[in-house]
C-alpha cells in the first residue's frame, strides 16, 4: 500500500521535504541541487522496485505517478504499465500518465525542431528556421523562476566558451510580463540570443514540444534536429563539450581526406 511505502521511506521523504524547503535560501548553490537530485533519484529507485515486485497492487500506479514518473523514466514507466493488470490502472490516473508520456515522446531525438516565429527583446521577429548550420542549445526559462536564473550560470559558461561560433545559444522566455523579462536580460547581462514566446505556456509550439517545466533545455544538431533533451547543470556542459569535440574530430578527418 502507499501508506506502507511512505512509512518505510519516511526518513528519506522527510529529508526530501526538508531539502525542498531550503530552495529559496540556497537557489544559487549548485551543491544543493545535486543533493536534492540524489535524494529524488533514491526515492525513484525505491518506487521502481516496489512497482516491479507488486504490479497488480492498486498502490503501484499511485507510486508511479507520485514518485517515479519524470522526463527520464517514461520508457521505464511505459514498460511497467504493460505488466500491470487493467484493474490496477484506474482510468483517471492512467490518463494523466499517458498524457505525460505522450508529451515527452513528442520531443524524441531525431525529430525536426518545430517551426515557430518568436520575438527578441527589440520586438523583432525571429524564425526557428534560423537554428541551423551549427548546433543550437535552446533553453526555456522565465525571469521570475529561481531555478531558471540558477541555470543561466551554466548557460553563460557555454556561451562564454563557444561564443555562438561552434555552438549557438538561445533562450526562449515564457514570461507573461515582458518588461520584467527585458529588465532581467539587462540586470543579469544575458548577452546571447534572447527570445520570447508571445503566447507563453499557451503557445501551440510550447504544448507540442511537451514543455512542462522550466528551465528545460534542448540540443539541436546543425540540421535543426533534436539531439538531446532535458539536460542541465554539469551534465549539460559535459555533453556540449563532448559534442563539440566529436564534431571537431570529424572535421579534422574530412580535412585530411
State the predicted function of each range:
Residues 127-149, 155, 168:
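Short active-site neighborhood of thiol/selenol oxidoreductases, capturing the structured segment around
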Residues 190, 199-242:
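Thiol/disulfide oxidoreductase modules built on the thioredoxin-like
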Residues 132-136, 164-167, 190-192, 222:
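Loop/turn elements at helix/coil->beta-strand transitions in domains of secreted/extracellular proteins
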Residues 38-109, 257:
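N-terminal targeting signals for export/organelle localization
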Residues 95-128, 192, 239-241, 245-249:
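N-terminal "domain-start" segment that seeds a small globular fold
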Residues 1-45:
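A non-transmembrane, solvent-exposed segment enriched in polar/low-complexity residues
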Residues 149-188, 200-206:
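Structural microenvironment flanking redox-active thiols in thiol-disulfide oxidoreductases
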Amino acid at each position: 500500500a502507499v501508506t506502507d511505502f511512505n512509512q518505510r521511506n519516511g526518513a528519506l521523504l522527510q529529508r526530501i521535504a526538508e531539502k525542498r524547503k531550503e530552495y529559496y535560501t540556497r537557489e544559487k548553490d549548485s551543491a544543493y541541487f545535486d543533493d536534492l537530485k540524489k535524494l529524488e533519484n533514491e526515492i525513484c529507485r525505491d518506487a521502481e522496485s516496489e512497482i516491479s515486485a507488486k504490479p497488480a497492487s492498486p498502490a503501484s500506479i499511485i507510486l508511479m505517478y507520485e514518485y517515479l514518473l519524470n522526463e527520464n523514466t517514461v520508457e521505464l514507466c511505459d514498460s511497467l504499465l504493460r505488466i500491470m493488470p487493467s484493474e490496477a490502472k484506474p482510468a483517471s490516473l492512467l490518463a494523466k500518465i499517458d498524457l505525460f508520456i505522450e508529451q515527452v515522446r513528442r520531443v524524441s531525438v531525431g525529430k525536426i525542431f518545430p517551426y515557430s516565429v518568436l520575438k527578441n527583446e527589440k520586438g523583432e521577429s525571429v524564425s526557428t528556421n534560423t537554428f541551423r548550420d551549427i548546433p543550437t542549445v535552446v533553453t526555456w526559462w522565465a525571469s521570475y523562476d529561481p531555478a531558471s536564473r540558477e541555470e543561466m550560470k551554466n548557460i553563460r559558461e557555454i556561451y562564454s566558451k563557444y561564443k555562438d561560433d561552434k555552438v549557438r545559444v538561445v533562450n526562449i522566455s515564457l514570461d507573461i510580463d515582458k518588461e520584467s523579462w527585458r529588465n532581467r536580460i539587462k540586470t543579469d547581462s544575458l548577452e546571447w540570443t534572447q527570445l520570447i514566446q508571445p503566447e507563453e505556456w499557451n503557445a501551440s509550439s510550447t504544448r507540442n514540444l511537451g514543455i512542462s517545466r522550466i528551465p528545460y533545455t534542448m540540443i539541436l544538431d546543425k540540421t535543426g534536429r533534436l539531439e538531446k533533451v532535458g539536460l542541465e547543470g554539469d551534465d549539460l556542459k559535459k555533453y556540449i563539450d563532448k559534442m563539440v569535440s566529436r564534431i571537431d574530430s570529424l572535421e579534422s578527418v574530412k580535412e585530411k581526406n
